[in-house]
Amino acid sequence: MAKLTESMTNVLEGDSMDQDVESPVAIHQPKLPKQARDDLPRHISRDRTKRKIQRYVRKDGKCNVHHGNVRETYRYLTDIFTTLVDLKWRFNLLIFVMVYTVTWLFFGMIWWLIAYIRGDMDHIEDPSWTPCVTNLNGFVSAFLFSIETETTIGYGYRVITDKCPEGIILLLIQSVLGSIVNAFMVGCMFVKISQPKKRAETLVFSTHAVISMRDGKLCLMFRVGDLRNSHIVEASIRAKLIKSKQTSEGEFIPLNQTDINVGYYTGDDRLFLVSPLIISHEINQQSPFWEISKAQLPKEELEIVVILEGMVEATGMTCQARSSYITSEILWGYRFTPVLTLEDGFYEVDYNSFHETYETSTPSLSAKELAELASRAELPLSWSVSSKLNQHAELETEEEEKNLEEQTERNGDVANLENESKV
């Protein structure tokens, strides 16, 4: 029994030693960005569903970015006006009501303290006593007098007297501060109401972007339109490609931004947006889509952000509308359905067909592959023409040499005949 107990003890000690030896050491590694962690190799089953692409800009134009761990919050207070304008309406209205209520209560308290310190509360029924504010018999009446003073609605039952210098000074201070509060809060509300963000609601983008041939070149296209009769002045369009990349040194750059040329050098990016327009991007060697084919497009994790800017004709304020397209919203081999028709004396736009597309014959190769095929098709033709020209030149030189030899032979025969005749 003692031996059995000793053997069991040895086994347990050996297991504990093995566990101590085999216990892994926790090594803390730097945390990579989410997209970098997603791109790391992992064992994934074949029936795994495709990972959904996270938008950088939503279809309605709002940026899908949240700022966290912002420690220097005092910076928001240094620009308090913009902070109030950017707040939601419910918070803005709450602050609007609270600011006026607090100022009325604050100055009402001061008016009540002046009356209390002067002893006006003790001589309410004394007709020979001249109070600072007549008929001020408590805090409620002082609060009402503060409202009448700051809103300048006019004095009635309660009036300040000329026997109270401290009341006159407080009246001046409240009048000035009340004007400042009115200017600040009313200005804030006016700016928030007149913001051109709502104007962007009537600037529409097509739900899909398309890739098809235009004038013999592969192009990426999307459509924009304005629903209002008052137009956008100095309208301009630009587009950016949002795609993560890894440099040759191994640096991972999340959400790298690349400009997409939509006519910057030709002036086509400046729009006269009276009717819907199709914005075209030619896929050439400078395009980020140069090597992307139809089969490769669904595998790409990219996002195209389009930005339309201009001035509102009615107010002159700058307006910006945004939208985006991910790979699932880019249709290869499609075109947009025409929406503009000529009626009796005017053009009519059918916005029911604004987002509609139809299929068209488009090669599934990338623009780079199409250019290589075109160059290969031109090489044999140029080679055959040059070879024929070279052969023709060689034949001409050979004929000239033969003619020269025949002429020399004839000249030699004539000379021999002349010598024989002389002899």
From Swiss-Prot:
<dbReference type="GO" id="GO:0005242">
    <property type="term" value="F:inward rectifier potassium channel activity"/>
</dbReference>
<feature type="intramembrane region" description="Pore-forming">
    <location>
        <begin position="151"/>
        <end position="157"/>
    </location>
</feature>
<keyword id="KW-0630">Potassium</keyword>
<keyword id="KW-0813">Transport</keyword>
<keyword id="KW-0225">Disease variant</keyword>
<keyword id="KW-0407">Ion channel</keyword>
<feature type="region of interest" description="Disordered">
    <location>
        <begin position="390"/>
        <end position="423"/>
    </location>
</feature>
<keyword id="KW-1133">Transmembrane helix</keyword>
<dbReference type="InterPro" id="IPR013518">
    <property type="entry name" value="K_chnl_inward-rec_Kir_cyto"/>
</dbReference>
<keyword id="KW-1022">Congenital generalized lipodystrophy</keyword>
<feature type="modified residue" description="Phosphoserine">
    <location>
        <position position="23"/>
    </location>
</feature>
<feature type="topological domain" description="Extracellular">
    <location>
        <begin position="158"/>
        <end position="166"/>
    </location>
</feature>
<feature type="short sequence motif" description="Selectivity filter">
    <location>
        <begin position="152"/>
        <end position="157"/>
    </location>
</feature>
<comment type="subunit">
    <text>Associates with KCNJ3/GIRK1 or KCNJ5/GRIK4 to form a G-protein-activated heteromultimer pore-forming unit. The resulting inward current is much larger. Interacts (via PDZ-binding motif) with SNX27 (via PDZ domain); the interaction is required when endocytosed to prevent degradation in lysosomes and promote recycling to the plasma membrane.</text>
</comment>
<feature type="short sequence motif" description="PDZ-binding">
    <location>
        <begin position="420"/>
        <end position="423"/>
    </location>
</feature>
<dbReference type="GO" id="GO:0034765">
    <property type="term" value="P:regulation of monoatomic ion transmembrane transport"/>
</dbReference>
<protein>
    <recommendedName>
        <fullName>G protein-activated inward rectifier potassium channel 2</fullName>
    </recommendedName>
</protein>
<comment type="function">
    <text>Inward rectifier potassium channels are characterized by a greater tendency to allow potassium to flow into the cell rather than out of it. Their voltage dependence is regulated by the concentration of extracellular potassium; as external potassium is raised, the voltage range of the channel opening shifts to more positive voltages. The inward rectification is mainly due to the blockage of outward current by internal magnesium. This potassium channel may be involved in the regulation of insulin secretion by glucose and/or neurotransmitters acting through G-protein-coupled receptors.</text>
</comment>
<dbReference type="InterPro" id="IPR003275">
    <property type="entry name" value="K_chnl_inward-rec_Kir3.2"/>
</dbReference>
<feature type="site" description="Role in the control of polyamine-mediated channel gating and in the blocking by intracellular magnesium">
    <location>
        <position position="182"/>
    </location>
</feature>
<feature type="transmembrane region" description="Helical; Name=M1">
    <location>
        <begin position="90"/>
        <end position="114"/>
    </location>
</feature>
<dbReference type="GO" id="GO:0005794">
    <property type="term" value="C:Golgi apparatus"/>
</dbReference>
<dbReference type="GO" id="GO:0005886">
    <property type="term" value="C:plasma membrane"/>
</dbReference>
<dbReference type="GO" id="GO:0008076">
    <property type="term" value="C:voltage-gated potassium channel complex"/>
</dbReference>
<feature type="topological domain" description="Cytoplasmic">
    <location>
        <begin position="189"/>
        <end position="423"/>
    </location>
</feature>
<dbReference type="GO" id="GO:0015467">
    <property type="term" value="F:G-protein activated inward rectifier potassium channel activity"/>
</dbReference>
<keyword id="KW-0851">Voltage-gated channel</keyword>
<keyword id="KW-0597">Phosphoprotein</keyword>
<dbReference type="Pfam" id="PF01007">
    <property type="entry name" value="IRK"/>
</dbReference>
<keyword id="KW-0406">Ion transport</keyword>
<feature type="modified residue" description="Phosphoserine">
    <location>
        <position position="16"/>
    </location>
</feature>
<keyword id="KW-0633">Potassium transport</keyword>
<dbReference type="Pfam" id="PF17655">
    <property type="entry name" value="IRK_C"/>
</dbReference>
<keyword id="KW-0991">Intellectual disability</keyword>
<dbReference type="GO" id="GO:1990573">
    <property type="term" value="P:potassium ion import across plasma membrane"/>
</dbReference>
<feature type="topological domain" description="Extracellular">
    <location>
        <begin position="115"/>
        <end position="138"/>
    </location>
</feature>
<feature type="topological domain" description="Cytoplasmic">
    <location>
        <begin position="1"/>
        <end position="89"/>
    </location>
</feature>
<dbReference type="InterPro" id="IPR040445">
    <property type="entry name" value="Kir_TM"/>
</dbReference>
<dbReference type="InterPro" id="IPR016449">
    <property type="entry name" value="K_chnl_inward-rec_Kir"/>
</dbReference>
<dbReference type="GO" id="GO:0006813">
    <property type="term" value="P:potassium ion transport"/>
</dbReference>
<feature type="transmembrane region" description="Helical; Name=M2">
    <location>
        <begin position="167"/>
        <end position="188"/>
    </location>
</feature>
<keyword id="KW-0472">Membrane</keyword>
